[in-house]
Amino acid sequence: SLFFSIGLLAHAQSCTGLWITIDDATGYKKSIVELYKKEGVLYGKVVYIYKRGKDGPNSKCTECSGKLYNQPILGMLIAKQLKWNGSEWEGGTILDPDNGKTYTCSMWLNENNHDKLNVRGYIGPFYRTQEWIRTDKIPTD
């Protein structure tokens, strides 16, 4: 039905925007990633780094290889090529700037709270899922 497909479309678009990432080890806010769509494909770039991080806003990707080695993490495109499958964004990749590794990635909104996004990175059969928190602004410190 038309109503159903409009609902799916709204659902597919609703993970665009600003998301706070949380450090798994400390539980502290780490960065803000902006998720945006380009030609129906989802991408994410780092738009803010909290001061508590390694080198704060000046952090470089010292563990990255190739062109990304030692590049600033602020502004870095870390999520790429995710496509909507009807229930989640999948088939893309996500880079963890802390270890320089790129993982296969999927993302989906928490069905009980659309201000929480599940972000799962896979290497082979192993995976880790993080929860990102929606925000509507970038701090101005």
Please annotate each region the language model reported.
Residues I20, Y43, E90-G91, K116-N118, ...:
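General beta-strand recognition
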Residues D23, Y28-C105:
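Central antiparallel beta-sheet cores of small beta-barrel/beta-sandwich binding domains
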